[in-house]
């Protein structure tokens, strides 16, 4: 049984992504996505922790008096929600900037796992393809933003925003992160965005669990600085094992 055909859970693919990112033939392709993530997410964390206490106290203060007893339960939930929201926003921005290099990383990981050449593009070819890659990133944002705005508005509703919204936001973030990172290997094969989403929906358990673990890691200081390249590697491993054969056949 080849390494890419070994069944894994969504969690397992993310953990496997760590091993792939550290492999000698992949490390050099990890560097540029890593730098982009460190700069943007690191700056975001500094801003978040400078203001977190003020934000949380404001939200807790908006609770009706008869729900004030929930404040001790809601504190950790709201902290996680704020961390996940801002980390997701800034990691999305980092992904947008690093998209060409994430695509190249996904290509090299697929070649490592499958032993087959994906294409003959070098760095110059990747740079030439940047407009198309950024258009794909924009397509993702068009899909994500209306839903994110709706959930953000839900956060502002007293009581409902402090109780239900954090759980909905976590589920939403898990799905969006699965789409964000799985899209790189799909896009390397020019598979349409809607077709990519439909493929992920066919294996929602693995897609959601992969995205959920990525979401958790994006909220952990220091570890969240390495999430981007690891998630690209893990999502590409999931593509090779779970989606590649069917997706390429259906494209014919």
From Swiss-Prot:
It is found in: Cell inner membrane. GO terms for cellular component: plasma membrane. It comes from the Bacteria. It is a multi-pass membrane protein. GO terms for biological process: cysteine biosynthetic process; sulfate assimilation. Signal peptide: none annotated. InterPro entries: CysZ_sulfate_transptr, Sulfate_CysZ. One of its GO terms (molecular function) is high-affinity sulfate:proton symporter activity. The chain crosses the membrane at residues 29-49, 66-86, 141-160, 164-186, 212-232. Keywords: Amino-acid biosynthesis, Cell inner membrane, Cell membrane, Cysteine biosynthesis, Membrane, Sulfate transport, Transmembrane, Transmembrane helix, Transport. Pfam families: EI24 (PF07264). HAMAP family: CysZ (MF_00468). High affinity, high specificity proton-dependent sulfate transporter, which mediates sulfate uptake. Provides the sulfur source for the cysteine synthesis pathway. Belongs to the CysZ family. This is Sulfate transporter CysZ. The lineage of its organism: Bacteria, Pseudomonadati, Pseudomonadota, Gammaproteobacteria, Vibrionales.
């Amino acid at each position: 049984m080849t390494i890419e055909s070994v069944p894994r859970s969504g969690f397992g693919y993310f953990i496997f992504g760590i091993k792939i990112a550290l492999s000698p033939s992949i490390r050099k392709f990890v560097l540029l996505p890593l730098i982009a993530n460190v700069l943007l997410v690191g700056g975001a964390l500094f801003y978040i922790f400078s203001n977190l206490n003020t934000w949380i106290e404001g939200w807790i203060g908006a609770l009706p008096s008869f729900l004030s007893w929930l404040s001790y339960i809601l504190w950790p939930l709201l902290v996680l929600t704020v961390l996940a929201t801002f980390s997701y926003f800034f990691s999305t921005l980092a992904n947008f900037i690093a998209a060409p290099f994430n695509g190249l990383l996904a290509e090299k990981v697929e070649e490592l796992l499958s032993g087959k050449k994906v294409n003959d593009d070098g760095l110059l070819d990747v740079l030439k393809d940047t407009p198309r890659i950024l258009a794909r990133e924009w397509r993702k944002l068009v899909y994500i933003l209306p839903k994110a705005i709706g959930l953000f508005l839900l956060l502002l509703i007293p009581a409902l925003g402090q109780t239900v919204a954090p759980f909905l936001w976590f589920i939403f973030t898990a799905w969006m992160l699965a789409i964000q990172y799985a899209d790189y290997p799909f896009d390397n094969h020019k598979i349409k965005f809607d077709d990519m989403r439909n493929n992920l929906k066919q294996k929602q358990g693995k897609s959601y669990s992969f995205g959920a673990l990525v979401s958790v890691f994006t909220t952990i200081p220091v570890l969240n600085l390495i999430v981007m390249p690891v998630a690209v590697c893990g999502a590409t491993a999931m593509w090779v094992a779970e989606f590649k054969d069917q997706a390429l056949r259906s494209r014919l």
